[in-house]
Amino acid sequence: MLLLMVGAHALEEAGTDVAATAEIPEGRTIGERFQALTRSTRWQKVREVRFTFRTHHPQGLSLVGHRFFLSSVEVADRAQGRGTGHLFEVDADGNLRRQIRLGEGPMYHPGGIDYDGRWLWVPVAEYRPDSRSVVYRVDPESLAVARVFEFPDHLGALVCDRAGRRLVGVSWGSRRFYRWELLPDEAVPRTPQAPVQTLNTSHYVDYQDGQGLPGTSWALFGGVSRLAAAGGPEVALGGLELVDLGELRAVHQVPVPLWTSRGQSLLQNPVAVQATEVGLRFSFLPEDDESVLYVYEVR
């Protein structure tokens, strides 16, 4: 059963009256500027924002206007498949504005989310690989929820290909890509149970979150890879990858050598990106429960 915490928003069936989305040139700007970044890029911290509520385990982050939407999982008993999926609306100062709960039975683990200009797309899966998921659309204004489809695998993140009218998901650990064609006049997949499927040939990081770049068939994914020398401590190295959603392959990869004071990679959890006047701005939310948004810029 889907639980809602805001007002009396009813669970809607995926509808057919979908407003057209205006393409935004920012997407191509982000993609082109990202491809100019290298391992020598200098990252400048410009702001920290402490979230004023318990965030649990953050999963996905999307910027809608001046608001952040954050998906998160609250685990009660992982072995028994019990927990709660959350979607939080947060203002620019880190204050909680509204929240809803998403999930059905053992499917309580939200993944990385994306905003297509009209809807937020949120996958909620069982907390284990090779399991199953349910995909929701959420209206960011009303927080009304539409259950779109179920899928027989763990979907760790979803991104929107606005240029190609496609939805792309990744499996647990992002080892597989799934791609669905959306119907011309509806924000629903043409064949929910039969997507294009291919292995992810990039093994640099496991994606935690992703963001489709408007006006393009690119998406930016962020994640971590855990490395350790024999007998030495484990280090989580964060990285960002630009993925061509038409070819389902990474076209540019950049390490992000940034950590919190406690040694966590800034890409441990979700990330969001924006274009600035001359560069790019990245917002990272790596910590659980008592989270701080770390904002960095590059040029």
Describe the role of every protein-language-model region.
Residues I30-R54:
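A short helix->beta-strand "capping" segment at the edge of beta-propeller domains
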Residues K45-F51, L96-G103, A144-F149, P192-N200, ...:
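A short beta-strand motif characteristic of beta-propeller blades
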Residues V49-A79, G83:
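Beta-strand-rich domains and repeat architectures in extracellular enzymes and scaffolds
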Residues T55-G60, G105-G112, D153-D161, S202-G212, ...:
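Repeated scaffold domains used in trafficking and secretory/extracellular systems
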Residues A79-H86, D130-Y136, R175-E181, A228-L242, ...:
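Structural motif
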Residues G85, G94-G117, W121:
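Blade-loop segments of beta-propeller domains
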Residues D91-G94, D139-L143, L182-D185, L245-E247:
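Short loop/turn segments that connect beta-strands within beta-propeller blades
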Residues H203-E247:
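Loop/turn-rich, solvent-exposed surfaces of beta-rich toroidal or solenoidal domains
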